[in-house]
From Swiss-Prot:
Membership in a protein family: Belongs to the thiamine pyrophosphokinase family.
Pathway given in the UniProt record: Cofactor biosynthesis; thiamine diphosphate biosynthesis; thiamine diphosphate from thiamine: step 1/1
UniProt-listed Enzyme Commission number(s): 2.7.6.2
Name of this protein: Thiamine pyrophosphokinase 1
EC class of the enzyme, as a word: transferase
Subcellular location: Cytoplasm, Cytosol
Domain of life: Eukaryota
Lineage summary: Eukaryota, Viridiplantae, Streptophyta, Embryophyta, Tracheophyta
Keyword ATP-binding appears in the UniProt entry: yes
Reactions catalysed: thiamine + ATP = thiamine diphosphate + AMP + H(+)
Role played: Catalyzes the phosphorylation of thiamine to thiamine pyrophosphate (TPP). TPP is an active cofactor for enzymes involved in glycolysis and energy production. Plant leaves require high levels of TPP for photosynthesis and carbohydrate metabolism.
One Gene Ontology biological process: thiamine diphosphate biosynthetic process
Residue stretches of biased makeup (Polar residues): 1-12
GO cellular component terms, A-Z: cytosol
Amino acid sequence: MPLPTMTHSSSFLRLPATSSPHPPPADDASAAYAVVVLNQRLPRFAPLLWDRARLRVCADGGANRVFDGMPELLPAEDPDQVRMRYKPDVIKGDMDSIRPEVKEYYSNLGAEIVDESHDQDTTDLHKCVSFITRNPPGSEESNLYILVLGALGGRFDHEMGNINVLYRFSNIRIVLLSDDCSIFLLPKTHSHEIHIERSIEGPHCGLIPMGSPSASTTTTGLRWNLDNTSMSYGGLISTSNIVEEETVRITSDSDLIWTISLRN
């Protein structure tokens, strides 16, 4: 029996007036976006995604990044007005990184502060994703996209913890984003169609079997396609591949990490 197909698109990074050579996936128009901001430098497109999101959550010190970083990304605007406009709905985590004055500022503006310092077994991103899945901004979980800003860069163990969250919540569409690339999980329960937004992403990409080896992965749309190919750490992994077509199709017997470069 063929696997059900999951479609993917980075159309959320497309500027509002930008056209695309192909329409977004059918479920894209009904997508409900939630943004999570972690404690790393904001990517250049943070204001765009913030405006598209229905729910905005800062993970602890991520609130500092919004407070400091949004005015830097919008230098032509009054910093105080920017800070008031880009107010998180929720600040959640251990509360060991957020500056006291930032916490007070957003609390006074009505942000919900959720102190989970009692929980030292999960990361701040895990806590935020758990909160969003319990309080989804849309009516259907299948339409939920969680866009994570600041998930890459900084300490390697933090990056690996963030990637682990993709596996912990494999039934949720979670995209890790930096200025340089995006990363998301391709669950083995589905075949996958990735609609490439050439104006904003590519051409470099990778398919990585981080959770477990893959005995069989097949792709189309790449320069170096895989044909029932096995992949594992210590063996072959598909890095520095090149997107050749508008749609990349992937099937695998293992969960895979997909990553693609983002254009400046």
